[in-house]
Amino acid sequence: MKRRFGRREFCIKSKSATFAVVYMADNTTKTTITPLEAAFIREHSGEDASKLLFRYSKESMEGFDVAFCVLQIESRNRLRAKLPCFAACEEFVFPPSINSSQTSGELSAQYKSSLLKGGETMVDLTCGLGVDAFFFAQKASRVCCCEKQDWLCKIAESNFKALKVDNCEFVSAACEDYLAQMEPCEVIYIDPSRRDENLARVYAVEDCSPNVVELQEQLLCKAPRVIIKLSPMSDLKSLCRDLQKVSDIHVVSVENECKEVLVELKRDYIGQLTFHAVNITKTNTDILSFNQETDETACEFVSSKEQIGRFIYEPNASLMKIGRFGRLVEKYDFKKLHPHSHLFTSDVPIEHFCGRSFEVEEIRKPNAKALKDIKKANIVVRNFPQSVKELRQQTKIKEGGEDYLFFTTLCGEEKVCLLCKRI
């Protein structure tokens, strides 16, 4: 259904209350929230946005814009978990269209700010909503925020005033144009758009806009250090091939879900590339670092089920993406089930493992007859010919519960099902 308020049109999917907000030709939008609007937003916080819009669509609301307020309520409902500091600020204005999939969450933005030494001068060439710039500003001495959309730049500047950030300046310009004429700084940060001209997702670094492969020399001329944020789907081998002077690649996961890949370029860097597997939780940040030469040579494999230890370990999403598991074996001294299974085992429990840990209760054959007594379990497939969906159809096991079933293949090509409990 559609509802019009002045020059704006809201398209609402009533089931999910998700907005696709289309601004008319003038592309004007509000940059501040009035006290009356703040009171309305506070009063209706957490309510269903589509119902609110329907309820107030026919009422004359003096002193504030109902559609704007509903947009703010919907944005806060949707992004409160990802951006708690911003959602909690009553004066913070969420723009009418925000690519929440590309916008950094606060936890990953805090990690990026930790990469700064402190006191640097910095330019964020793709400011957007300003999440990363906000956290960079807490470490850098000065941050220049460049945003090509003038209306979004004005919103970000107003929001930073509301957040009481006073060491940022804002420039409305295409990042390529600003890069050409900007003064040198110590660090440049860039998060190229991962949408093409038809708004379809792209993942290859050369398909993003701007194309940092083409800009990398110019970037390093303006700053000795460049940090590039890319898709979690980025191919790491391609990045190493297409980008020069790469010193570090950070694969960043939040709660074991891969969120982004950060590539660091350094102007005068000569040496081995270092990978950082990062998994951030609300209480802890696990980081395992290793150089490009680390490989599988140190791995010992399990050839039969009798060699499976009491415990099974599944590396976190960042480690799984990087894929160099020799460093894990070196650190934890355990065996791998198969070169392609990416599961590890030991007889001794490992504290603070960078991933999930399980205790093996039984080893069974991977068929319906051997599993007929199990009614509910979490099924995990690693290097196994059948999918989770196929196994559920075959075994009639429902999703959930405390049990985990790992369907996998050992180094001797024996297929097994490991009945485990998470520890």
Which residues are covered by each model-predicted region?
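SAM-dependent transferase fold signal centered on methyltransferase-like domains
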Residues: 2-423
